[in-house]
């Protein structure tokens, strides 16, 4: 299944995602896979605030299902994905 759907992320994460794609010249789907693979810890939840403003982004249904399965903290998917994108942006 390679269908795309939309999900939400914070405005900051959206800007970080754009910067990562421009800096690395990697396609959107690759950057999303890298972000989803990032581990989010309890300290990340406390250390990195996520704004309430949201933007929609494209994601494959498989990637969204993976993200939901990795949501051990049972937090909002938008917050979880925003944290993962932020952690990836710290490495770029």
Outline where the language-model segments fall.
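Short, basic amphipathic alpha-helical segments that act as recognition/interaction helices
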Residues: 20-49, 73-92
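Short Lys/Arg-rich basic patches
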Residues: 1-15, 21, 41-65, 71, ...
């Amino acid at each position: 299944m390679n269908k795309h759907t939309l999900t939400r992320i914070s405005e900051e994460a959206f800007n970080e995602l754009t910067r990562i794609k421009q800096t690395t010249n990697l396609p959107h789907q690759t950057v999303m896979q890298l972000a989803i693979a990032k581990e989010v810890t309890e300290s990340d939840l406390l250390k990195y605030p996520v704004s309430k403003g949201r933007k929609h982004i494209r994601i494959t249904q498989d990637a969204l299902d993976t993200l939901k399965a990795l949501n051990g903290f049972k937090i909002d998917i938008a917050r979880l994905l925003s944290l993962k994108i932020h952690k990836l942006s710290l490495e770029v």
